[in-house]
Amino acid sequence: MTHPLVLQLRFTRKEFMRGLEGLGEADAQKRILPMNCISWNVGHLAWQEQRYFLYYAQNQLPFPQINEAFAYGAPASTPTLGEVRAAWAEITEAAEPWLDSRTSSDLVAKVVRNGKPSRYIYGSLILRMIYHYWYHTGENMAIRQSLGHVELPEFVGDIDGEAPYKPE
């Protein structure tokens, strides 16, 4: 059975992507300073997913260019939405088997980096990922509103139907 925290991550990813519905390439690449553009935000979350669930968890780095272009503190850029969405989709799909196999005891295990236990545990990384998605979901909605987009999705979607609270 999939851990409830992983189910919440999946719902959060879905809501993040729902916030991109109807967004064209040109608007996805527009920067309203000092914010990054929406497409950069997608790449940034792909970077974090890859870092936590592929690199830290499985020692895989399938998209080194994502690691370089969208890491925390990386310079602003205006990538195409199609490019970063495709990378995001591949990264999140590659993370699924690992996420599906997590147990509560796995989630309190320390992340090992450079052969040494770090101060992080996997459950906290999942929480960090969830909260980071919501941060950028709100930022993306603000950018879209500033660009004059209307009839945007309301949040937090159908949490009661799709991701209600479930005990372990």
Identify the residue ranges that each predicted region occupies.
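A structural signal for long alpha-helical coiled-coils and helix-turn connectors
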Residues: G24, L99-T103, R144
